[in-house]
Structure formats: C-alpha cells, structure tokens
Swiss-Prot record:
Function summary: Catalyzes the deamination of adenosine to inosine at the wobble position 34 of tRNA(Arg2). Essential for cell viability.
GO molecular function: protein homodimerization activity; tRNA-specific adenosine-34 deaminase activity; zinc ion binding
Domain CMP/dCMP-type deaminase, residue spans: 6-117
Keywords for this protein: Hydrolase, Metal-binding, tRNA processing, Zinc
Family affiliation: Belongs to the cytidine and deoxycytidylate deaminase family.
Transmembrane spans: none
Protein name: tRNA-specific adenosine deaminase
Record has ATP-binding as a keyword: no
Length: 167
C-alpha cells in the first residue's frame, strides 16, 4: 500500500486551522505546520501575547516542536507551511534549522523576509538556503489577517467611544 502524498493546499489548510486558534486567543492569526516525510512533526500558532514571549511566533513554535520530535535541531528536508510570509527572526530560525522549504500563503509587505521587504532565505552571506513557495491559499490567508485587524480596530474604536462617554 503506497502512502498518500498531501498537497501544499492540504497542509496550508491545516496551517489556517492553527491560525484560527491564534485568533481565538486574541493573537495575530498566523499558523504554521512543519512536515517531514509527509508527516506532521511540529505545529504552532502565534502566541507572543499569551506567553509573554516575543519569539513565540507560529513558525518558531513549530520548529521547536519539530526539533523535539526529531531529537535534532537540524530539520533537513522538512517543509514549513505558514499562513504569512516569515519575518526576519523566523527566517533566521529556518536557516539555522536547515529546513528545505518554506511554503507561505500571504505576502507581508511590512516585515516579510522571504522576498517582500527583503530575502533573508536566499542571502549570499547565509550558510544555508531555504527554497520558497509562495501564494498557496493567499487570498484566504490574507482575508483572515484583514478580518482580524478590522475587528481589532472596531474594538479599539468602541473602547475609545465608551471611555469618552464616561469622561
């Protein structure tokens, strides 16, 4: 019996499910799943607020879990699926962990380090290159983020209005 090979879209849907967990925790909704040999070895969603940890990005959480599962920080041939283009910190962690590929959904024009703002993953000064596949379920990934930030702006506006009416 042969093993089923799951598609980029399949794994990105899994990452989107994890991103919704971040939303439920009132964190920026980014999710990540780390896959090695067609098997999940790490999962994560943004948790820096709840964990009081600026490094608790979805990608870092998934890489940490993957290292524990593999009993090695070198995650050679692993693929990281993430709903948003990685930041500089996460791109650096991907290089140090030696993953083979990152697959992301939405681009991040403000802090994206996989081609939007800069390309850390292919920088000639780095000792490892990570292959990049982008745009998988990009519209769904971007919509989740847009909806979240729209909701947050509305909440802030309502709080300010309530505060000004009590002053």
């Amino acid at each position: 019996m042969s093993e089923v090979e799951f598609s980029h879209e399949y794994w990105m849907r899994h990452a989107l499910t994890l991103a919704k967990r971040a939303w439920d925790e009132r964190e920026v909704p980014v999710g990540a799943v780390l896959v090695h040999n067609n098997r999940v070895i790490g999962e994560g969603w943004n948790r820096p607020i709840g964990r009081h940890d600026p490094t608790a990005h979805a990608e870092i959480m998934a890489l940490r879990q993957g290292g524990l599962v593999m009993q090695n920080y070198r995650l050679i041939d692993a693929t990281l699926y993430v709903t948003l283009e990685p930041c500089v910190m996460c791109a650096g962690a991907m290089i140090h962990s030696r993953i083979g590929r990152v697959v992301f959904g939405a681009r991040d024009a403000k802090t994206g380090a996989a081609g939007s703002l800069m390309d850390v993953l292919h920088h000639p000064g780095m000792n490892h290159r990570v292959e990049i596949t982008e745009g998988i379920l990009a519209d769904e990934c971007a919509a989740l983020l847009s909806d979240f930030f729209r909701m947050r702006r509305q909440e802030i506006k309502a709080q300010k209005k309530a505060q000004s009416s009590t002053d």
